[in-house]
Structure formats: structure tokens, C-alpha cells
A protein has these predicted regions:
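Conserved GNAT-fold acetyl-CoA-binding loop/helix
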Residues: 21-42
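PAS-family sensory/regulatory domains
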Residues: 27, 216-218
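Acyl-donor (CoA/ACP) binding surface of acyl/acetyltransferases
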Residues: 1-23, 51, 55-178
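Sensory modules in modular signal-transduction proteins
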Residues: 174-196
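Conserved hydrophobic beta-strand signature of PAS-family and PAS-like sensory domains
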Residues: 200-201
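Terminal output helix/cap of sensory domains in signal transduction proteins
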Residues: 39-42, 111, 218
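Short loop/turn motifs at secondary-structure junctions and domain boundaries
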Residues: 43-48, 182-185
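N-terminal capping loop/helix in small sensory signaling domains highlighted by a polar->aromatic N-x2-3-F motif
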Residues: 19, 204-211
Length: 218
């Protein structure tokens, strides 16, 4: 469940905001003092117009947050993005709730909103080069490499890996295999991706083991 942050979320937010490793993965200063945590929470709640809490449906407890913001200037200046409309996502999930599909579910919901209802051309998402779980999640969702940036953090300069996901309704088909693969790979049934000549170009892992045997791409 995604919703705006509420004052009642502060204790749950404070519980995961003090995680130093999470702060390092996000490139922010460590939050130890309650005043610093409060300042950070109030900013997200009151000043970020598109910051949403990621909430467990069963108990309505906050387990993370997701931001939708304008594209960073260095990425907005890239030639391949000129004339295109996009937004940047950032997210975090408390350690106890990671690897349970919550982040993927939240990101997919936001992507659907940005693509289907707001008609953006792309969604951009990145992570620091040492944040392997985030990188793998983005790639699993169909994001493709866009650029590397070197940015300052409280712990020193770090390199980021920036990814992009194109809107399938506004993008040439040649760019979309990664997107569609990410969608059908979530299905436990046999699903195939074909071109207009009905030639199989991709089968999800649940379909067959030997793609080439059935005329598909390896």
C-alpha cells in the first residue's frame, strides 16, 4: 500500500532511519539524534509533494518510503533524453521487510501510474555502485543502464549506476524486450513474447529450459 506519510508514522520511520547501512546505501548522513530524524521525517512528510509511505496492508505499518522527483540535472542533459518527459524514483525499505517483494510491488504501482495515467516517456532510477540488491532489483524490473555519475556523499565521493525504463506505449519496440521480459518473468505459468510474425523471441523461465530448441532467443 502506498500513501502519504502521516504523523503517526514517525515511530516506525525512526526505527529504520537509524540504520547506518541504509543511510550509507542512500548516500545520506547517519541519523542518530532524534532531532535529525524528526527533521528528515518532517521534510519528507511536508515538503516533498510526491513522497509516499510503503505500508504493509495487514497491519498498516510503515516499512519504507518512495519518492518521485524531477530528473537530476546531469541526467536531464543527456542527448538521448532531450524532448522526452520523465521522472526519477528513489526508495528504501526497512531491513526486516527486504526481499519480500514489497519494493517491487510499490515500484510497479508507481510505474503504472506514471506511464498509464500521466503519460511520461520514461522512469529513471539509480543506486550507488556498491548497492547490489537495489541494482539487481532495478534490472529485474526491466530498467536498463543509462549512465554513471560521481556524486559527493557524507562518507565521501561515490559512483552511481543510473537506470532507465521506457514507457512501452511511447517507445519503439526495439527498446522494449527488457521491459517485457521483466513483466513475464514474474509469471509462474508459461508465457512467451512473440514478434508480429509470431516468432518466439523470449520465453520466461517457467516455460521451457531450452529456448533455442523451440526457436526462441537464448
Amino acid at each position: 500500500l502506498l500513501r502519504r506519510l502521516e504523523e503517526a508514522d514517525f515511530p516506525a520511520y525512526a526505527a529504520y532511519a537509524v540504520d547506518d547501512e541504509m543511510s550509507r546505501m542512500m548516500g545520506r548522513a547517519f541519523l542518530h539524534a532524534e532531532t535529525d530524524i524528526r527533521q528528515n521525517f518532517d521534510w519528507l512528510k511536508d515538503k516533498e509533494p510526491r513522497c509516499y509511505g510503503i505500508v504493509e496492508k495487514a497491519n498498516e505499518q510503515l516499512i519504507g518510503n518512495l519518492n518521485i522527483v524531477a530528473l537530476p540535472a546531469p541526467l536531464a542533459a543527456l542527448p538521448q533524453l532531450q524532448g522526452k518527459r520523465g521522472q526519477t524514483l528513489s526508495f528504501c525499505i526497512r531491513r526486516e521487510s527486504q526481499r519480500k517483494g514489497y519494493a517491487a510491488e510499490a515500484i510497479r504501482a508507481v510505474i503504472a501510474e506514471l506511464f498509464d495515467d500521466e503519460h511520461f516517456d520514461f522512469v529513471q532510477c539509480g543506486c550507488y555502485s556498491f548497492n547490489t540488491p537495489s541494482r539487481m532489483l532495478q534490472e529485474r524490473l526491466g530498467f536498463q543502464f543509462l549512465a554513471n555519475l560521481c556524486v559527493p556523499t557524507p562518507q565521501g565521493e561515490a559512483q552511481t549506476i543510473e537506470h532507465i525504463l521506457w514507457n512501452p506505449r511511447r517507445t519503439p519496440m526495439s527498446d522494449l524486450n527488457a521491459y517485457f521480459k521483466s513483466v513475464i518473468d514474474q509469471d509462474t505459468a508459461s508465457v512467451v513474447l512473440c514478434d508480429l510474425n509470431h516468432t518466439i523471441v523470449y520465453m520466461n523461465p517457467a516455460a521451457v529450459v531450452d529456448y533455442k530448441k523451440y526457436g526462441g532467443a537464448s
